[in-house]
Amino acid sequence: VGGDSAAPSEKANPSPKPTPLWDRSPGSVAAVGDSITRGFDACDVLSDCPEASWATGASPEVDSLAVRLLGRTGAARRSWNYAVTGARMADLPGQMAQAVRRKPQLVTVMVGANDACRRTPSAMTPVSAFRADFEDSLRSLRKALPKAQVFVASVPNLKRLWSEGRSSPMGKQVWKLGICPSMLGDADALDSAATLRRDTVQKRVEDYNKVLKEVCAEDKRCRYDGGAVYDYRFSTAQLSRWDYFHPSVNGQARLAEIAYRTVTAKKPLT
């Protein structure tokens, strides 16, 4: 320091707190994903019920993430659901392209179950392709909306859903229509081949969740649920009474709670 330098002021103004990267009260929400976000089988058999969606639904019984963040009127005006029943990770870039047109402040992502729910385990989406499409989706979002936030839900524990749902004779009949055959096919079979098949699917779900966590962690405006959806112990009350696999209205409300907790937390969940 040179001799002519001014002495530091004793009452230096405190530097303003930096604006946090994560806004815990975003002003608009766009949802992308699959049948869970469409409320499939929550209200009627083999039908979407977007009003019961955990992300953007208007149902008072669900109290969706959008309603919790924006209020009922705000959610009706500033939340959009671009999820599609049957969607896989390969469909996410296209859904994201639709969502960015709305310029949402928060995008919710719940996808991956259909990548594991194939006719056979060998038909499941490879982990490398799953990662590439997720990275592509976040990259395109970031390019269009640099400050948009992302909530990423983990893929549910499909093996637990099999374990819970197989106690229902009606549920098992609906499963035969082709709901997640890689996990739910031959639901009562407990031989070594069936056990290996289910364990293979379960391992793939865990690998998908690892990808979701890792890719999200690379983006400062992305929050993963810390595995909360995967860890949630769905009971029959939280499962559709038609297929005992998709969330019921009660189950959708639990998903909304998990999402709201993650989005409004002071620090990201790990």
What residue ranges belong to the model's regions?
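Conserved SGNH/GDSL esterase-like catalytic core that processes O-acyl groups on lipids
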Residues: L46-A132
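Serine-esterase "nucleophile elbow" of acetyl-processing enzymes
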Residues: G3-W80
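C-terminal or late-domain output modules
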Residues: V45-C49, W242-T270
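Polybasic, low-complexity, intrinsically disordered segments
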Residues: V1-P26, R139, K143, K147, ...
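Cytoplasmic membrane-interface segments at the C-terminal ends of transmembrane helices
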Residues: R72, S235, K266-L269
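Alpha-helical cap/lid subdomain in secreted, periplasmic
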Residues: M96-W242, V249, R261-T264
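Short, function-defining helix-loop hinge/capping sites that tune catalysis or transport
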Residues: A42, R118-T120, A256-E257
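Flexible, glycine-rich phosphate/dinucleotide-binding loops
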Residues: R38, R88, K159
